[in-house]
Amino acid sequence: MIKRLKTLIVLVFVLLPFGLLSQTATLKGIVFDGEGNSVSGATVAYANQGVVTDRNGVYVLEIPAEKKVTVTFSFLSLKTVSFALTLAANEDYEFNPVMQADIEVFGELVLDVKKRKRIEGIQSFSPEMARKMVGGNSGVEAVLMSLPGVSGNNELSTQYAVRGGNYDENLVYVNEIEVYRPFLIRSGQQEGLSFVNSQMTANVDFSAGGFQAKYGDKLSSVLDITYRRPTDFEASVDLSLLGGQLTVGDKSEDGRFTALGSVRYRDNSLFVNAKETETNFRPRFTDLQSYLTYKVSNKLELGFLGTASINDYRYEPLTRQTNFGTIQDPRALLVFYEGQEVDQYRTVFGALKATYVISDNYTTKWMASAYQTAEQEHYDILAQYRLGEVNTSIGDENLGEVEFSEGIGSQLTHARNDLEALIVNINHRGQIQSGVHQVEYGLKYTNERIRDRVSEYEIIDSAGFSIRPPLVDFQNNQPYEAFDSPIVPFNASSGENDVVISRISGFAQWSYRDEWNNGELYLNAGVRAHNWQVDDGVNASVTQTVFSPRAQMSFKPFGSKDQLFRLSVGVYHQPPFYRELRNRQSEVVPQVKAQQSIHLVLGHDYSFNLWERPFTLNSEVFYKHLTDVNPYTLENVRLRYAALNNAVAYAYGLDMRLAGEFVPGTESWVSFGYLKTEENIDDRGFIFRPTDQRLKFGVLFQDYVPVMPDLKMYLNMVYNTGLPGGSPSYADPYDFQTRLPDYKRADLGISYDLVHDNKPGKGLLSSFKDFAVGVEIFNIFDVQNSITNTFVRDVYTKVQYAIPNYLTPRIFNLKLSAGF
């Protein structure tokens, strides 16, 4: 079976299908008159094709993709509106024109969405791809991790690192509102659902660095999500062995009010129960999201984004056997567990947004949001282990069992960690357009209140002896001198904190776009300012301020070749969030400074036709110089900071992505990334940073059977070289510069569309707009990837063995999707 799958994947890349499907995109929206009323019976047309708006003014028009199309809106006694646009294959774009009173007046608005994003250094992809692409955590993040410069070595986690940064250095916006992730997550299997709901998504934009001043104060990347507005009643259901989702949307008869809501449920048992640790595992990840809009008038619109999530995680490990070593010297670790872990995460998020169009050239926005979370991490787990040789005698009834134990011991881990946080934001933004010039500005106030209790320890016993912490200055001269020190845990951390952080930040930026020197020139310059005050209730409050100037320049020469050259340079600061203020002893250090990074990014985009189909080659070379670096350790997905600005670092590399229609009518890409990042802590010399992932290859591929186009395939393959790590958490990184094994994974999804727009349902399926069934194969080659090591000592030789903690093996999943 596996051999056939390998052959299939090779054939996919060598023998591309010869069938040709039409390339289309969808333009939709609502037509309004000057009074804000929807226009029924208006004609929406391009070339010789067209549709008429329904009684609510709604239209849906399919147009050719990857080419400039002029669309005209016309209605008796109203001005004719005409505009040109270029959309990608399968892209959905919403446009709501306003037709003023008059007759036969022709105005033109040139709109090239992809081109505008390209000159700003933004990568965009269809949300439909995020909905259909296969992955351990399918959705937007699964697609991101196939991009160059983006790495993630845990299929159960939605967290990602970009160009040498860590998980805390990425901005995520939904409808221009910043969203947050949980604080106490230690492993991917605890995470559950991502905030971003791919079924509600209309646009996905991503920048891997060198982004503009209008985005916030983080060092690495920006993910900008826009939720969609339904144009008619809709409902969809997605079911699988991993959970399910129900999404419902509708609008009012006059088109002023729209509502979109979704309920999601996820159960990771399919993944966790397939791992080598036998468990009683009962996770329950549930969330509810809603997006509401109301058009008060032609100038004022209100929006609401809300979410509530309840995550319950109950984990009771029973036994584990991990085989390692070589063929000549096979070894195994056998562990028996007692105890359990019970975690709870309760999150509520709400945001209000008002958009007011003062004039055709001036738009303002007011936003207010609140994020509240209550998190609990409680566990008491006793692990008793045996380390020894494995019985390899074929035919023996004890084949594969551990015998001749070389290490016997136990480990007790305990935690009572609780956290409550309330984050409130008030934000104002404005945009002024004057000819080829555009000015944007913003001002934001944030108040963060975090209450945290940490109480955790680890006790290790080996052959009846309690192992003391690995302290450098510890001395034990037994039996010559009596040792009367108390027994202490091998590792411990405790503390209680109540911290209030107040922030005021703002930005102003100017953009210019016009023809210059036989080409098109785009300039952008801006600056951010950020002032914050930390009050921990114990020490005197600390106030700091940073300024971050940034600039971009893009040039697109006229001519037969579609090329774009781009330069970005700027200073990026990351003022400390709560996690970065807390050291490894769980103490808050208010004096921690903002980390600073100077970015230089050179980019080149080249669009061309291959096999008479469109392709684009994106290339970027980047360099980062970082100062006031706050060192951290990475264990699984848990970050622990030193809360010291005692390091400097650098990162440089190359990102390349070839995207296009490898198969007619579908978008796929192949990506390559090279990265080197090192840090110098306390002038001890440069060493690898925890996210120094040297090479990255990614393939995201869509295919179909030419004679049966409803049978489709989705392939997601990633290869990452190993991260520095795998050493004990207490180890000095200057003493342990080892790397984990390379991360290799391929996920395959196959689906069949029983009902769609061009294939109406019959019989029991007649009430569905679309209906599809499929199967997913995760980790199709059954590669054993590891993200951490468990260290066990041999009592006889005093040698410590690094036992890999493997991630998920090959898993099969069934999937069903239906739309009404």
Give the location of each predicted region.
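Periplasmic N-terminal accessory/gating domains of Gram-negative outer-membrane beta-barrel systems
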Residues: 79, 86-89, 115-211, 222, ...
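Short, acidic, small-residue-rich periplasmic hinge/interaction motif at the N-terminus
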Residues: 32-37, 43-45, 72-78, 88-133, ...
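Gram-negative outer-membrane beta-barrel transporters
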Residues: 516-521, 623-625, 644-728, 817-819
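C-terminal beta-signal and adjacent terminal beta-strands/loops
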Residues: 665-668, 719-727, 752-820
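Surface-exposed extracellular loop regions of Gram-negative outer-membrane beta-barrel proteins
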Residues: 218, 254-273, 285, 320, ...
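Structural signature of Gram-negative outer-membrane beta-barrels, strongest in the C-terminal barrel
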Residues: 421-423, 444, 493-624
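Transmembrane beta-barrel wall of Gram-negative outer-membrane proteins
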Residues: 236, 242-265, 278-317, 341-370, ...
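Membrane-embedded beta-barrel scaffold of Gram-negative outer-membrane proteins
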Residues: 365-369, 558, 566, 594-652, ...
